[in-house]
């Protein structure tokens, strides 16, 4: 889980703007700390 003060731009991925925090998802970076369901999509 990554929380930054700005919207991260990652290639071949997409970023979610969440109030008070920014969560980014990418093919190379799975958000295992955020959602387990997201990991299931990449297995």
From Swiss-Prot:
Entry's Gene Ontology cellular component terms: chloroplast thylakoid membrane; photosystem II
Domain of life: Eukaryota
Record lineage: Eukaryota, Viridiplantae, Streptophyta, Embryophyta, Bryophyta
Induction cue: By light.
Coarse class of the protein's main subcellular location: plastid
Function, as annotated: May be involved in the regulation of photosystem II.
Single GO biological process annotation from the record: photosynthesis
Family in the record: Belongs to the PsbP family.
UniProtKB keywords: Chloroplast, Membrane, Photosynthesis, Photosystem II, Plastid, Thylakoid
UniProt-annotated location(s): Plastid, Chloroplast thylakoid membrane
Name of the protein: Oxygen-evolving enhancer protein 2
